[in-house]
Amino acid sequence: MKKGLLCAVCAWLFPIVNGMAQTQRSMTVDQLFNLIESGSNVLTAQKTGVDVASRAVEEAKSKRLPDINASLSASYNGNVLMTDRNYSNAKGFSQPHFGNSFALEAQQVVYAGGAINSGIRLAELQKQRSENSVQMTRNQMRFVALGQYLELMKLSNGIKVYDSNITLTTKLIDDIKSRQKQGMALKNDVTRYELQMESLRLGKRRLEDQKSIINHQLCNTLGLADVSIEPDIDLEAISDNLDSEQLLQTEAANLSPVLQQSSIDVKMAEQQLKLSKSELLPKIAVVAADNFAGPFTYDIPPIDKNFNIWYIGVGVKYSLSSLFKANKSIRRAKEQLRLSNTVHSVAAETVNNNMQQAYTMHKQSFVELRTQQKSVELAQQNYQVVNNRYLNQLALITDMIDASNIKLNAELQEVNARINIAYTYYNVRYAAGNI
């Protein structure tokens, strides 16, 4: 019996000792966001993607530069064999055996049907898309981490509510035991409140375990280890004096990364259409070349001299196959543009709906808080009345338990309502795209 009791006490004390061993760290919302920025591998990878996109822009712009090629060669030339067309009357001629050649070629594209400019613009838009993806991920990670952060605060406050009710119930049990000794209460009354106490302790333990789980998940998100995060946020500073819904809708339309992403996709589809149409246009370039070589082998016998040939001119190139191939890529590009415009319209509608919902829920959260505060006030009054009646033997123990449960539930709901104000406020900022 004693051994079992000792094991039970150790099991109950272990999470407390373990929690005490864990380092506590007070954290504001700004500190939370800074840790996400510095500790997120996902954000680091996406920022690297922006650097890659920047290099792609430089690469696309380099296509405006001239193409210059140089070649240098030395060779051993064999003697010449010449025959008639029927392969008879063969004759041999000696020629200089050492050959050399140096060639220099340059080409500058002056018109490519807009293909080069469209390629550069596509690369720039891809860079913007990468930067916007970083912002989208940053907002998402901040909002998810903030939800865990506020959940920790909610659980911590809930544990305090349980502690308060456990203290109150302990005092009540002592009072009932005292009355039992005086013959004014039954053993069953004590038993019922001891059961109530066990229920309170179990409820508190559940909140503590849930807090441990959320804390572990948040630490992983922030790149922290073995730290007990204590939220530090002034809930009273959050008011319902937001801008009007219309101003917030305008802000969301201008700042929402979701809308910006779909807008960039539309612009990329437009450039892709221009790129496809450029296949139907000619390509014009200025060309120049110089060739210094020897010996001169275009005469018989060959002349053992070096000679130099150069030219400069304009080259025009047109792909005749584009007349029956380019139309397919153009049709595909047009369909992609239409799809991108549709997706952008859907995204705008979604952002508008999300902002309206977030704004309405934030306003509603203050109504809920006032309602829950009134409920707590009434529940506490009811508890005091029932407690006084019970002490005067005018109420049953079941009435006391009901009043205690109503009071506990009201206090927990008030805690949830107060935290919900902060959550709905940041949800408005998230919907606007600037959390």
What spans do the regions from the language model cover?
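Sec/SRP-type N-terminal targeting helices
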Residues: 42-48, 61-62, 96, 110-138, ...
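Bacterial Sec-pathway N-terminal export signals of envelope proteins
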Residues: 20-69, 73, 79, 225-226, ...
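Periplasmic alpha-helical coiled-coil/stalk elements that build and connect Gram-negative outer-membrane
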Residues: 3, 27-31, 55, 138-253, ...
